[in-house]
Amino acid sequence: FDSYGFTKRTTLANYGYIKEFLDSKVKRTMIRSRLGVLKNHVPNSSLAELNWHRDEIICQNIRINIPITTSPEYMFEMEGNDVYHLELGKAYTWDTNIAHRVLLTNPAPIDRVHFVLGFSPWFDYDENNQCWESNEFWGKHPFQMLVDGDVFSGLEILKAE
């Protein structure tokens, strides 16, 4: 992964509501983030189910997943866990180093669009010196940083049942 190679927002992220949202909510240095679109494919096809994958450990990249458009046919599955529907109006995070995937259970009426934000929990980018430096949160568990509002403001933390 080269998440730390991404040190600047794209042009799109500096306009309109996206800029307003990021400026008002984000408290840590953003790294590899995206607006992910999963087209409505045929269920159980190789295109409908993203392959199982792992991302960086949470101490390197803590992610927040915000559904923009979705429907109940799009499900999220983590290795060793149940299958979940990520609902609109909520933000989600998990240990992305545990294998996970998105799957489509039936034809969906719309495409799935999620805002996936990655944050560096323990390092901040110094634009002037063009380097990463450890910050005041060094060693604090990234999930506790979320609970304490150190990463992203306005999150209500709910425990999965």
Region locations from a protein language model:
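Long, compositionally biased interface segments
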Residues: L117, F123-E161
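A short hydrophobic beta-strand segment most commonly corresponding to one strand
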Residues: I62-P67, A91-D95, P107-E127
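Short beta-strand His + acidic residue motifs that chelate non-heme Fe in jelly-roll/DSBH
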Residues: N51-H53, Y74-F76, W94-P107, V116
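A short beta-strand-loop-beta hairpin characteristic of the jelly-roll/cupin
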Residues: P67-L88
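A short beta-loop-beta micro-motif enriched in histidine and acidic residues
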Residues: S46-I64
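Short, solvent-exposed loop/turn segments at secondary-structure junctions
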Residues: N40, I57, T69-E73, Y92, ...
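Short catalytic/ligand-binding loop motif for oxyanion handling, primarily in non-cytosolic enzymes
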Residues: A48-L50, R101-L103, F123-N128
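Signature of the catalytic double-stranded beta-helix
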Residues: F1-A48
